[in-house]
Amino acid sequence: MPLSFEGTFKAKRNVNLGGKRVSNDRAQLLRKAAMERKNREEERKAENNSVAVQSLSRGFLARRKFKQDFRERWIYKYTKSGRTSIRFNTLEDIKCSISLLVLFAEPDIDLPFVSQVAHNILVWLENLIPLSNGMDDTPKSHLKVKILKVQETLSNSNDSWLWQRFSSLLLNCLVSSINSHRIEGTDTSAETSLLHCLAYVAPYLKSSELSTYYDSVMTFYAQIYPKQNMTNLEDIMSLSLLTPVSSKTDENANSSSAFLFHVLASDCFSSIENCIPPDLIIDKVFSSSLQLSEEACISSLLNLGMIKVFSLAGNCLHLLHTEYKNSSLWKFCSYILDALYVFSGESVNSRIQVVSDVDDDEDDENAFSQNYYSHLQMVAKHFSKNYANQSGIVQRSFAECISSTFITKAFKLVSSNTLQAMSHFYATMIKLFPSNRTSILMYISLVETNEGSLTRSFSRFSWDMFSESPVYQLFHKKFDVQNVLKNDSGYWFQLQLLIDVYSRMLFTMIDDEFHNDKQNPLYPVMAEFCTVLKNLVLGLYWDVQAAKDVDCKSVVDISQLRVSSTSLLQQLYRINSRKQFLPEDFFLMSEYFNLNEFEANALQESELASHAEAEINITYKFDNFSESRPRLNILNNCSFFLPFHFRIHLLQQLLLLDKQANGYAQPFGHLKHAVIRRNRIFDDGFDAFYNFGKLLKGPIRITFVDEHGVVEEGIDGGGLTKEFLTSICKTVFDINYGLFSETKAHLLYPNTHAYAQDVERLRCYEFLGMLIGKCIYEGIQIDAAFASFFVAKWLGHPSYFDDLTSLDPNLYEGLVFLKNYDGDVENDMALNFTVVHEEFGVRNVIDLIPNGSNISVTNENRLQYIHLVSNYYLNARLSRQCRAFTNGFTQIIDPHWLAMFHESEIQILVGGDPVPIDIDDLRRHTVYAGGYEPNSPTIVLFWEVLREFEEEDKRSFVKFVTSVARPPILGFKALMPSFCIRVNGEDETRLPTASTCVNLLKLPMYSTKQTLRDKLLTAVRSGVGFGFS
């Protein structure tokens, strides 16, 4: 590239004629412009504020001058030497005076003028009201005349705006006087005139001023009462309290609400209630105030705060003692109780699970599921703590409402108008006072209602009213929670109390009385009543989310309704099981379910529940309700909605899932081996397996040692395990062994002797529970029948008086005689609250209640005595043994699985189905070995002979080959291993033998039918199987 050289070596200078450029001058300019805009905006605001202040100042000064001018004019016209010099002769005189007065009067400055005007208006008003000379010359009638006359006079003036301004002025002056403590002086004439005059014009107050008005009235009374005789002020207090609510203005409902929440909620109302006719409060206040919605009314109560609501409760409940025929008062009192329940529940976690040990079913029906009952207990405890701090007036008002005298008086005159509100009231009351639940329900159940010429028990009256209601038709199918429960709450409280009362009646009603329509008022309509209950219960358990949504938005306690209705339905199902009074399959509701889908979803819910409980890793009493498990809810609480065989199949699937989850599905996996001496079978079994706990679910392997100490040959493929379980149960269920006793019907229950309650024996009962659970877990049936009251303990169900008939029929008949005795129980029978327990010749007297030996049984307390005696024999004596047995049983069988069945169904689970033996079913599920085939001559003869057996001989044969006289629940297809017939030689002189451990019949090859019959009958009637030939 060519280079050029021009004689210079410096770069050319760059000259910028625009001046030096700064790189950030743009950003700086933007900031400067923003600052200038801000300064200009602030200047504009300052100028506007200055103008506004100047305007306000000029306005204030102008108004002050304006008021002062009017004040001077009014003083010049109406005063002389500082006193009013005019008497009002006409309404126009009054209007002329106050039209000026309201323009300038200020409470702090013009109080003397306002009080003087008020005094003179009162003088004029008193002249309007004539002296009473009629027949009804009472303070109450005189008060009504005053109010009506003044309202009529003022309303005709067509100047409501003026009276509104004047009433506001009077109120402001009264408030100012109270706040400045002027009333504490000796002279209160000015304030009394203000209040008296204000009482007449109070209907013109704005709704926003009513609360202040009533607060001022009560404060005035509270401050003046200790210093003056109230007799002179009774008329003024009556007028001031009742005039607003007695007016015919549009503000009447607001006045009534203000009266309720600011007068009746005052703790000093009880001292002035004599000034106010109760019927005026009832007619004017409650009927108008309840135009408010349920939610608005309760919301207003909650805004008052708990202390005020307690005061309100005391005053309203006191009114209720005399005005118990008024439905509006009952309804409002119900709302008050709802508010107190909400206050008490705010600090309680409604889903805390509390472990409680309820052994003695000593009180009521145990109607509540564990979680909900615990929640109620905590709410009631919180309420009781606050209740204890209330005044004696409040406590006496509550005590009166739950007394026998008041309940009898009120419910005797219950009507269709008051029924729902009274039901609401007492349904909430028994939640706040759970210790009085039993007595309240008993008092109500004993009442005979009188409506017109018809006398009925409360339960029948309530049912008749409900069956005539528009919602009754909704219960003829599955209950639609979402669309029904959110409205018409009165019907649900009515149904709630009916359920509670009838449950209490059943608790003291024996079966014979239940089936007598003279002693059981609902017996003629029992089918309809049970239809309502089952459809209600199904809806509440199935539509869980809908019920939860309604529970959040409604005053109806859905949980209480669900628990109570479920408990009653379960009671009625048990009664029907003992003696049927409903059609066959009445309780089945399977038409509402696709059983295949139900089973699949129930298995999924159970698996999720098992995982959740495993993660929690705590021990607690199982809860039979969960919002996330609707199908398990139904299975655990009302399993009778579904067919029994469906539930059996579902149980088998649950057991299979549990085995798979724990690795027990393989028969030879994780074997636990034990050597068992036949003559020490229980002791060796206890030593080998007691400490296994839940691990006993897994496969076990048994080696037997005979009575000579020789180890028996054989590999345990399940048969020896079955023989071990059936043999050990046969041993301990023998009453001579000492662990069990039997009823006259040969039904087993734990021994009640003292030695049965020592620690070692209780461990034996726990082990037996584990063994029975193991039998069910493995599908092994045992030949044992248990008393229903004992099986009920496995389910956590209480035992009832009628269960005594199976334990001790003589005792049962004696208590029934006592219950129905018409004479003088105390003198004729000379009983006291004790029982005599004799053991090994030693008699012990046991008190049923403290100092029971000194308390006589009377006509009044005999039901308590009957209940306590039943509880002692069915519960107290058995509690420790049953608890130990159940603890062992539930280690193997999940309580949720167990809850799917009724007592009688669990007996079938343990010992098989008490149905006739189906020989054809047995033949279809038989296998052959050793040379026999289905068409072998001996086999053909065998089935002919077996089919001709009597039913008793058929059962003996089944017991001969399986160890149990009843077939499996799902038929012989469920027999494991399958029934097998094997050749046992050709010697026809030998008898058939059996190996019950593997359901095996060893049958010689008999050639004639008669020989086969004789030999088979001899074998099965002998009761001996293995080795007998």
UniProtKB/Swiss-Prot annotation:
Asked if Transmembrane is a keyword of the record, the answer is no
GO terms in the biological process aspect are: ERAD pathway; protein polyubiquitination; ubiquitin-dependent protein catabolic process
CDD domains (UniProt xref):
HECTc (cd00078)
Q: Catalytic positions?
A: 997 (glycyl thioester intermediate)
What is this enzyme's class at the first EC digit?
A: transferase
Signal peptide positions (record): none
Q: Does the keyword Nucleotide-binding apply?
A: no
Query: Can you say where in the cell this protein is located?
Result: Cytoplasm; Nucleus
Which segments constitute the HECT domain? 692-1029
Q: What induces it?
A: By stress.
**Record GO cellular component, one term:** cytosol
Q: Which InterPro entries match?
A: E3A/B/C-like (IPR044611), HECT_dom (IPR000569), Hect_E3_ubiquitin_ligase (IPR035983)
Disulfide topology: none
Reactions catalysed, semicolon-separated, are: S-ubiquitinyl-[E2 ubiquitin-conjugating enzyme]-L-cysteine + [acceptor protein]-L-lysine = [E2 ubiquitin-conjugating enzyme]-L-cysteine + N(6)-ubiquitinyl-[acceptor protein]-L-lysine
Which Gene3D superfamilies has this protein been placed in?
Hect, E3 ligase catalytic domain (3.30.2410.10), Hect, E3 ligase catalytic domains (3.90.1750.10)
| EC id | 2.3.2.26
The Gene Ontology terms for molecular function here are: ubiquitin protein ligase activity; zinc ion binding
**Domain IQ per the UniProt entry, residue ranges:** 46-75
Any idea which UniProt keywords this protein has?
Cytoplasm, Nucleus, Transferase, Ubl conjugation pathway
Major place of residence: cytoplasm
Function statement: Probable E3 ubiquitin-protein ligase which mediates ubiquitination and subsequent proteasomal degradation of target proteins.
Q: What is this protein called?
A: Probable E3 ubiquitin protein ligase C167.07c
Per the UniProt record, the source organism is: Schizosaccharomyces pombe (strain 972 / ATCC 24843)
